[in-house]
Amino acid sequence: GTFSYFAGVEYLGHAASFHPCGDIAQIFEEVCSGQCELGVVPLENSLQGTVGVSFDLFLKHEVFIQAELFSRISHCLLSNAPTLAAVRTVYSHPQPLAQCGGWLRAHLPGAALIPVESTAAAAQRAANQPDAAAIGHGKLADMLGLGVLARRIEDEPGNWTRFVIIGPKSA
């Protein structure tokens, strides 16, 4: 349920089989080892620049870019809490927390902001806590049975990420 997952579905369709990885390094490792035919990784974000870990991993692993895609990034606040006032904790990956910082300060000034490894992991945590929320893709709500307390909470609406599809052979 990460933004990389939704970008992959957008590009490859639902006919492709997807499975979660713990982090970007694991995607590279699984593509190199043959556990996965392809991987989807973020390369650049229009607000925060290059995704340094992805560039570093290209230097360590023999993988090739098969395709690239650009995806608009819009964040939602996902929760089982009945209202914003009931939210005490917000989980997300550090980038969405930063990209929504102004909105969070304005609407949830007392909430604890907890960085986790991915937006999907954040949503899973929020699903298990009645006073918690997660920042992530709106489609995560359907996947985990969460409500959407707010949409388009990013501070800058022109947020795009360049994703690349990587594979073990040159395209």
Describe the predicted segments one by one.
Residues G1-A171:
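Domain-level signature for soluble enzymes in the chorismate/prephenate branch of the shikimate pathway
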